[in-house]
Amino acid sequence: FRLCRLAHQMLADPYWPKKVKAHHEEDIAPCVGCNECLLAGFSGKHYYCAVNPLCYAEKAYALPLPNGQKRNVLVIGGGPAGMMAAITAKRRGFDVDLYEKEDKLGGTLWPAGGPDFKADVLKLIKYLETQCKKLDVNIHLNSPITKDNLEGDYDKVILAAGSTPAMPPIPGIDTTVLASDYLTHQATVGKKVVVIGAGLAGTEAACDIAGKDGDVTLVEMCPDILFTANHCLNNDQHLRKIVKDRGVKVEANAKVTNITPTSVTFERDGKTMTLECDTVLNAVGFRPNNQLEDLLDEKYDEVAVIGDAVAPRKILTAIHEGYHAIRVME
């Protein structure tokens, strides 16, 4: 059993045993239980790992050795993509400035690790932050980059500004509580909650609330929950089991037409229905923060947009794009 459990961790960091022996546990890239490795295997592909871009590609994707050439890199955004880009740049011997608008690093990993059954994701934040600090990345917190303060000479700029919760044109949408705010303990919810959106974030938030004795209903316009989620079947089945075991109710094929602070009205099959509640949680998705892209392209020769700033996706795409954006630098 222990060897089976270790197998995933060995994909995340094959040097795990050596780091443990040397008492460098803080340098171990943690398995977050996303099962991207299994998804790859079940799809007939070679195995890959969300937190390790070199998994099964140690030679193909190895970093060029530092040659003494100094390069200056600007990273905008301190989420997983930005942190991995900064770490990779320092490992290549480059100078790095990382600017993050919030007061801490981590980005959307914080809400991703918010549910009671996904705490392993928080270990990834700690690992990435530790590597940034050990490598002396020049980190600027509470420092949003805008068109008015963008300055400096950089050989490459990485736009990794992440994403922002979407606000579709539904009457009353501005009265909702963001699922990301709930999952990061910036907002509380009442006993009876309606969650709009049953993708991964909405379903996980609903399960977390239900696990705290909440009365939760998911309202989803698609035919089923997790309809567009591209994740491993194991994770899908596990999350559906939590939905069932915790008594989360589901209203699928439901188009939300109106929201108040204590109700959600939706249409289905020509009929209009209203759910009363204490709190309405908004989990309808995210949109990329890429407004600086055109300005960066005008000012700098090398610009790479990565992670959720391209489109809201997975931890895997964020980590891998952060690594490869720096790996390919000449």
Regions found by a protein language model. Name each.
Residues 2, 7, 155, 191, ...:
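Conserved acidic residues
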Residues 2, 22-24, 114-118, 234-237, ...:
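Short, hinge-like loop/turn segments at secondary-structure boundaries
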Residues 6, 142, 253:
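Short beta-strand and adjacent tight-turn residues that come in two discontinuous sequence segments
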Residues 95-135, 184, 207-254, 310:
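Rossmann-like dinucleotide-binding cores of NAD(P)H-dependent redox enzymes
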Residues 70-99, 105, 141-148, 160-170, ...:
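Rossmann-like dinucleotide/flavin-binding elements
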Residues 126-166, 257-266:
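Feature captures the FAD/FMN-dependent oxidoreductase FAD-binding
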Residues 65-73, 203, 254-264:
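Surface beta-strand/loop "capping" patches
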Residues 1-76, 80, 84, 88-91, ...:
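Flavin-dependent oxidoreductase catalytic cores
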